[in-house]
């Protein structure tokens, strides 16, 4: 019985994933407050990476790369909007903290994806990864500016 239920629910979940992604994107796009936008990026980023992973599994590297670039654009725009508020991220971490969580998770998931690609396929993904890593480092530095820096 449980197996039959699982089989009947699986198509619904597969169908609802694009709907969920569209709903999350719509809520993200409508949000005007940078802190709330950063908070909305967390579930949106997870849903986008679910889609990216599926595209990689289906052999659609171009679609996956476009999705990854879209995530990068969203993360960059949230950072710019947060910075435009001219508030100290160390004292007012709202938004920065959520953005850093999302970017860190994106980097982790991207690292897991890249190993499944050929070296030729990896390069454009690694280019985006480098930009996301730079964003992550900036966010950490803004959130924790008084921490000693590693002089490597």
Segments predicted by a language model, with ranges:
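Long, charged/polar, soluble alpha-helical segments
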Residues: 14-152
């Amino acid at each position: 019985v449980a197996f039959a239920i699982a089989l009947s629910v699986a198509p619904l979940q597969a169908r609802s994933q694009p709907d969920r992604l569209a709903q999350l994107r719509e809520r993200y796009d409508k949000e005007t407050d940078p802190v709330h936008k950063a908070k909305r990026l967390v579930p949106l980023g997870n849903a986008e990476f679910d889609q990216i992973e599926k595209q990689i599994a289906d052999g659609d590297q171009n679609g996956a790369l476009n999705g990854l670039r879209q995530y990068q654009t969203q993360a960059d725009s949230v950072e710019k909007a947060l910075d435009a508020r001219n508030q100290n991220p160390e004292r007012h971490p709202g938004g920065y903290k959520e953005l850093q969580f999302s970017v860190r998770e994106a980097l982790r998931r991207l690292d897991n994806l890249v190993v499944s690609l050929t070296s030729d396929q990896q390069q454009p993904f690694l280019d985006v990864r480098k930009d996301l890593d730079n964003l992550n480092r900036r966010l950490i530095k803004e959130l924790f500016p008084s921490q000693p820096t590693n002089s490597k």
